[in-house]
From Swiss-Prot:
This is UPF0178 protein Rsph17025_3122. Transmembrane segments: none annotated. Belongs to the UPF0178 family. It comes from the Bacteria. Pfam families: DUF188.
Length: 161
């Protein structure tokens, strides 16, 4: 069965992800260093990791694999999850795959270099929108179906069928 891992710190789509996970009967892990409400549904588990750089990312990367779905905006975590065979969906609905994760990493690094070169630069990305939320729900639904299929196929392969 597919599992859903949410990089929950500052994730704007936790409630939407929970609804999709429950509908699919999938276990969901909300991974953060605190500050989120415990979920009410038994399929949804809050995982609190120690404060520190990338503790939530490490927890997710150590567990996610083929047949799982990871929701994150963190590109290095997404790269690790993709390498492990997981499907990755960003909160804006963009999917990250082996075909595009290299470009995403390069763009991230370039933008970090540009920001560090201009200390007076202000602003950030555009605000999260209803359209982003809608794209996310569509992408997560497709990813959960694909992950369930991959998990089913992996189970059949292990059973020798």
């Amino acid at each position: 069965m597919a599992e859903l891992y949410i990089d929950a710190d500052a994730c704007p789509v936790k409630a939407e992800a929970e609804r999709v996970a429950v509908r699919h009967g999938a276990r969901m892990y909300l991974v953060s260093n605190g500050g989120i409400r415990p979920p009410a549904h038994p399929l949804v588990e809050s995982v609190f990791v120690p404060e520190g750089p990338d503790a939530a990312d490490k927890w997710i990367a150590d567990r996610a694999g083929t047949g799982d779905v990871v929701v994150t905006s963190d590109i290095p975590l997404a790269a690790k999850a993709v390498a492990a065979g997981a499907l990755v969906v960003k909160p804006n609905g963009e999917t990250l795959t082996t075909a595009n994760i290299g470009n995403a990493l390069a763009t991230r690094d370039l933008m970090a270099d540009l920001r560090s070169a201009d200390p007076f630069r202000q602003g950030g990305g555009r605000p999260f929108s209803r359209a982003d939320r809608s794209r996310f729900l569509d992408a997560l639904e497709r990813a959960m179906r694909k992950a369930a299929e991959a998990a089913r196929d992996a189970g059949q392969d292990e059973a020798g069928t």
